[in-house]
Amino acid sequence: LKQKKKIEKIGVSIYDHNQLQAILENFDIDLVQLPFNILDRRLIDSSMLSMLKNKGIEVHARSVFLQGLLLMSEQNRPDKFNRWSGLWRIWREWLNDNQITALEAAIRHAISMPEISKVLVGVDNVDQLKEIVTASSGVLPNIPDEMFTNDIDLLNPSNWSAL
């Protein structure tokens, strides 16, 4: 279809980073849409993002707010996420110490990655979009290693119903 100019790009949307390797082994894709957020370094540490960029594959990041969880106050976060209270404490302290909002940190992290071509966000109204655009400008402070997690129960929202 690409050769016939019926389509310009072939892409996939994945939910789990493990799906990506199998897709790349079997298909010639132009872009991948994937979950990416400030707590999750798996794609960075595995060099998967670099490999995608080197292959000329566009990366579109979604769920940069971890389905809104990163933006919730401690009072509004559902109790089932309390098992990560240590991580939430580190997150909150880092935000306070660096005088940055959760929105600013989450969006700036995603757009600061040179391997990421586009960042997709969902909004309910124009004001939210304006707020995200404004938050995207500015410096992202260094992120401490203790703020990263590989806990798939937290990082993959499809696991949240079992919590």
Regions found by a protein language model. Name each.
Residues L1-L155, N159-A162:
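Beta/alpha (TIM)-barrel catalytic core signal, keyed to glycine-rich beta->alpha loops juxtaposed to Asp/Glu
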